[in-house]
Amino acid sequence: YMRQVANSWNRTEPWSQQDQAYRLYVLALAGKPDLAAMNRLKETRLQRPVSQWLLASAYALSNQQEIATKMIRDLSFEVTPYRETGGTFGSTTRDNALILQSMVILNMQQDAYRMLEKISKAMGSGNWYSTQETSFALYAAAQFVQKYLGSQKGIDITVKTNSGNENVKTDKTIWQKQLVLQGDKASVTVTNNGQGSLFVRQINSSAPL
């Protein structure tokens, strides 16, 4: 059915373009890409960045990585704030989640992490989100974790600071260390001894004089 609808599609409205891009993305996810319909959509002037992200994902899933890479070159990560109360019930957060899915498929790990942070901050804000927004956000986050952290079992790192080296091995996935200033400087080097991805965040704080 989806292939039939994809082949008969001939609209140009932004929302319809996004519907078609998502349709082709799902077909590619199912291992049944429709390259003819994908090529037709690619030749259309896509009016929403998320449509381009979805179509690029469809190409990547169809072993057309070169085309996918060209499509996302200089493509915006930003979604204009909006919320639909009908149609696809789209929103900024829902579209960010779709872009995160695309980034994971296209192996854009650093960009995907920043998008995951943005989505996590939004979902943790206490604002109301629809079931669709929540489900897309959780699904995209799960894809990120599965690809980049799925095989990781805890943390195995070496931390070098002003006071020496420290080997840290724990089953936990989060570890914190407070650095002590020596004079007005504190330096740290973290070496990942494990097989999975490691994300390091430095948080600075000070008291006014």
For each feature predicted by the language model, list its residue ranges.
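Long, domain-scale non-catalytic interaction/scaffolding regions in large secretory-pathway
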Residues: 6-209
